[in-house]
């Protein structure tokens, strides 16, 4: 499994390619092409990289809490897991981690971590540190 930081670094380096593309097109193609759109795309990609990092960090740490490798948090205790998922976890111990991870990612996939408030909400699922 890739670390959240490695996933972020890979996404961030792809953003650097957009920056280079902007520099090239603005210097060499400004008469026929408005390269400012590339800058907008770069900003969107960088925000997306941060969002992906927080999603991956929260998902991996929540799984670690579930496995007993991290302490439970107040918000983690309130995270809703459907009865059907918990039944699968109990009845299929060989796939319990995968089942739980899939459900976490399904629910977190609805969230966006693009503001300081939403990022703090995600971190509270995995840490009781005061934010």
Predicted features, each with a name:
Residues 16, 50-51:
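Structural signal for well-ordered, non-membrane alpha-helices
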Residues 45-46, 53, 57-131:
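Helix-loop junctions and short alpha-helical segments
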């Amino acid at each position: 499994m890739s670390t959240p930081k490695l996933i972020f670094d890979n996404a961030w380096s792809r953003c650097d390619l957009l920056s280079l593309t902007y520099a090239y097109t603005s210097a060499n193609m400004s008469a026929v092409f408005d390269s400012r759109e590339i800058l907008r795309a770069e900003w969107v990609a960088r925000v997306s990289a941060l969002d992906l990092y927080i999603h991956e960090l929260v998902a991996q740490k929540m799984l670690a809490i579930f496995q007993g490798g991290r302490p439970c948090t107040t918000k983690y205790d309130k995270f809703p897991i459907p009865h059907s998922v918990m039944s699968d976890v109990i009845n299929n111990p060989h796939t319990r981690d995968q089942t739980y991870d899939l459900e976490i990612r399904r629910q977190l996939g609805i969230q966006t971590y693009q503001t300081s408030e939403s990022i703090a909400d995600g971190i509270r699922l995995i840490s009781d540190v005061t934010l």
